[in-house]
Amino acid sequence: MKIGTDQYNTFDTMTMDCWNDRVYYEGKEFPAGHFAAEILNFAGAIHDPLLERITVLTALVDDLSTAEKSKRHDIAAQLKPLLRNTVSWLYTCPPFCYCESQSTYENLEHALSEERLDRDYEEEEAHLPYLTLSFCEPILRILVAIYNFCLLIRAFEMKYLRRLKRRNADAFAKAAHECFDEDDSFLILLEQMPFGEVEEFFSYPRVVTGFKYFQDENDEKKWKTAQRVICKRAIDFYVFDLMNGLHHGHAPSQCQGCGRYFLTTNGHIPKYCDGVAPQDSRYTCRQYGAMMHQKEQNKQHPVYRLFNTRTGTIRKHHQRGKISDDLRREALYLAESYRDKALMDNDYAADGYARDMELEHIYAEAEKRLK
């Protein structure tokens, strides 16, 4: 049997299988810490739009719970499109983006149907919309979990992980201890969370653990044992994945190019992710960052300093009408040729480059080319 299969994953139960530094969810393999890093891209600001979504939905669900029978249909009509939109958003978030979603939409329609609302009102002694509440509660808890986790772990990444000179399991353990156990400002942030008591953050997540047996992909005669972790709350799922990742030397980091959070799995100090660079879609952030770094280094290179000075003067002469368009074009071409030769030939760079880059020489050679 393949690892990561026959799991039960819904909005109120999340299951992952752990093997070495990998985790398996819905039959797919991920590095430990993947979900904790990716979810940071979905929320994290103090006044995040997610907070408004939580507030609006909570108010409507509360109204539906206490409303008279005659008013419940109108409230449900307001709640249903907002809830449908929220479910759609959740299915873009990890880990739910890897799950089947059709049954959830069907359950939503049934839970908020007029027939079901009327039936619950008549059959329930407290007249509560039982099915609606049982459907909405885990969704609201997930939203709060995402908001709380992202706000807190973004702060952890910025204040602790980002400053580390070494990125390994030992350094991550020390950073987690300093942040979660000793940092008063982090504890104050915990206390000030708008819905902190709903989905409380603990660095020791509450999970159910067991074991799962699976066949080796390379040799079906061999069987192995993975740890199965079951979480009844999304906050515990994300925290476990974060701490499991840190334990294996994996940690979230923010790309200096596009601003997205990504997972690092080695000891290198990260700067850029492998996503598409927003500055130029032809490159990844890593490629674009390397190119810009090289460009900055080039500015300090003696060959480039002289080249930039001369070409700047040529352009100014052209702007002031001292040289023609054709002479400008040929002069710039020659300057680039001398620069490239100097970069390839150290002897020329040390002796002939400065002489050839004199303006009088460049203009004289350019005029020869125009004849």
Where are these regions (language model features)?
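Short helix-coil boundary/hinge micro-motifs
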Residues: M1-T265, Q294, N298-H318, E330-A342, ...
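Cysteine-rich micro-motifs
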Residues: G267-Y288
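A contiguous, mid-protein "functional segment" used to position or interact
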Residues: M291
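Charged, low-complexity interaction regions
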Residues: Q319-D326, D347-Y348
